[in-house]
């Protein structure tokens, strides 16, 4: 039952990629199966890919990934989820005294708390307007596009669909560029200015770029805007891409190749 006559509520859904429930083989298998089964992430024929995924990748990768997650896991659990919850609390505190009709939830594309669960909470709070904010500054079909798919898949089952605004990018927003620049300056104050700053973005297959994905261009522009904002020269800043998966060519230059084939520490690189 909906309340009538009261001021309509605005729901804000903050989303991110996600995290396993625990840093062990069992939970990583569940998480990776959901993540790597997303057709936005892996653009290969479904039947062929599912055979590879189920018979090869999910037999090997969960154990290796679990060990990596154990290295970053804290007493509060997943760092990504902990950060997301702290961000949520600060945002809620900021708005609570200004507008009690705005409510917030966090939803992860993969793992928990899920986007469907977060939207259900907002539905129960009777939101009539919905703002979706994926925490991806640069639009990419594999991240922002996938989030849009999940949100709309849920909303299309609702009887009363709220008015929705979906923020699909903010890679060139002034406040974002200033925040990045201030973060770098703050680090310099604690250490020293390096000879070169490496902006390392998560990579995607080069094929996605040639098929029209703007992600690569948006990453380059973010780097350029930070460079201009901080008054740096071309020699003082560089864009690279990390986390290559499989044998296919991904966006270059690879961060790993830069660090492993050069004396990065001796040359004063800061990633």
Each model region followed by its residue ranges:
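Short, solvent-exposed amphipathic alpha-helices that sit
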Residues: 83-91, 146-154, 213-228
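Conserved small/polar residues in nucleotide/adenosyl-binding loops
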Residues: 260-268
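Hydrophobic alpha-helical segments within soluble ligand-binding/sensing domains
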Residues: 174-195
């Amino acid at each position: 039952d909906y309340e009538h006559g009261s001021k309509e509520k605005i729901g804000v859904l903050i989303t991110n990629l996600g995290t396993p429930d625990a840093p062990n083989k069992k939970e990583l298998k569940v998480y990776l199966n959901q993540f790597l089964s997303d057709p936005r992430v892996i653009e290969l024929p479904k039947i062929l890919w599912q055979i590879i995924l189920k018979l090869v990748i999910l037999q090997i990768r969960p154990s290796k990934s679990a060990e990596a997650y154990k290295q970053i896991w804290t007493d509060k659990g997943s760092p990504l989820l902990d950060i997301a919850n702290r961000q949520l609390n600060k945002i809620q505190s900021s708005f609570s005294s200004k507008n009690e009709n705005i409510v917030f939830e966090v939803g992860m594309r993969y793992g928990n708390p899920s986007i469907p669960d977060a939207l259900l909470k907002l539905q129960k709070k009777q939101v009539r307007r919905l703002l979706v904010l994926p925490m991806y500054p640069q639009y990419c079909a594999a991240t922002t596009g996938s989030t849009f798919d999940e949100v709309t898949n849920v909303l299309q089952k609702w009887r009363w669909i709220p008015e929705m605004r979906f923020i699909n990018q903010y890679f060139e927003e002034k406040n974002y560029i200033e925040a990045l620049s201030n973060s770098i300056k703050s680090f310099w104050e604690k250490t020293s200015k390096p000879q070169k700053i490496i902006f390392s973005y998560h990579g995607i297959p080069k094929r996605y770029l040639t098929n029209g994905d703007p992600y690569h261009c948006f990453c380059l522009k973010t780097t350029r805007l930070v460079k201009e904002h901080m008054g740096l020269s071309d020699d003082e800043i560089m864009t690279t891409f990390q986390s290559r998966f499989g044998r296919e060519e991904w966006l270059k230059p690879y961060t790993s190749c830069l660090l492993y084939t050069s004396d990065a520490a001796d040359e004063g690189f800061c990633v």
